[in-house]
């Protein structure tokens, strides 16, 4: 049974311009486990992100957390792009600083 991922993008701490923070992309509920998750800054892939170990829930759906350090400001736009067999094209979810 294939299941599409749920994608949530949020900062670890409330966003303040110029103050270092962590950007998280939490992807959950997907199956099969093969998935590609990228954090983007202004549409460009951020290198050197960290990824948790693949974990699964009791119902055998999987979840992953990808995160990186970042410093929010009003100029840059951040998002998370996910590629999975259930998605016809990559899903991109923007970070909303008020989330």
UniProtKB/Swiss-Prot annotation:
Main location: secreted
PROSITE patterns on file: IG_LIKE, IG_MHC
Biological process terms in GO annotation: antigen processing and presentation of peptide antigen via MHC class I; immune response
Keyword Disulfide bond: yes
Cellular localization per UniProt: Secreted
CC terms in the record's Gene Ontology section: extracellular region; MHC class I protein complex
Key words of the record: Disulfide bond, Immunity, Immunoglobulin domain, MHC I, Secreted
SMART domains: IGc1
Domain Ig-like C1-type: from-to ranges: 5-92
Top-level division of the source organism's lineage: Eukaryota
Disulfide links within the chain: 25-80
Signal peptide location: none
InterPro entries recorded: B2Microglobulin, Ig-like_dom, Ig-like_dom_sf, Ig-like_fold, Ig/MHC_CS, Ig_C1-set, MHC/Immunoglobulin
Function: Component of the class I major histocompatibility complex (MHC). Involved in the presentation of peptide antigens to the immune system.
Homology family: Belongs to the beta-2-microglobulin family.
Subunit structure, as described in the record: Heterodimer of an alpha chain and a beta chain. Beta-2-microglobulin is the beta-chain of major histocompatibility complex class I molecules.
PANTHER family, per database record: BETA-2-MICROGLOBULIN (PTHR19944:SF62), MHC CLASS II-RELATED (PTHR19944)
The name this protein goes by in its record: Beta-2-microglobulin
């Amino acid at each position: 049974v294939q299941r599409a991922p749920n994608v949530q993008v949020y900062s670890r701490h409330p966003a303040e311009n110029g103050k270092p923070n962590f950007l998280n992309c939490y992807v959950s509920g997907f199956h099969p486990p093969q998935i590609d998750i990228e954090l983007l800054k202004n549409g460009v892939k951020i290198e050197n992100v960290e990824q948790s170990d693949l974990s699964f829930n009791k119902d055998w759906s999987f979840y992953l957390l990808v995160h990186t350090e970042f410093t929010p400001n009003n100029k840059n736009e951040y998002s998370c792009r996910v590629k999975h067999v259930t998605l016809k094209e990559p899903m991109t979810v923007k970070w909303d600083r008020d989330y």
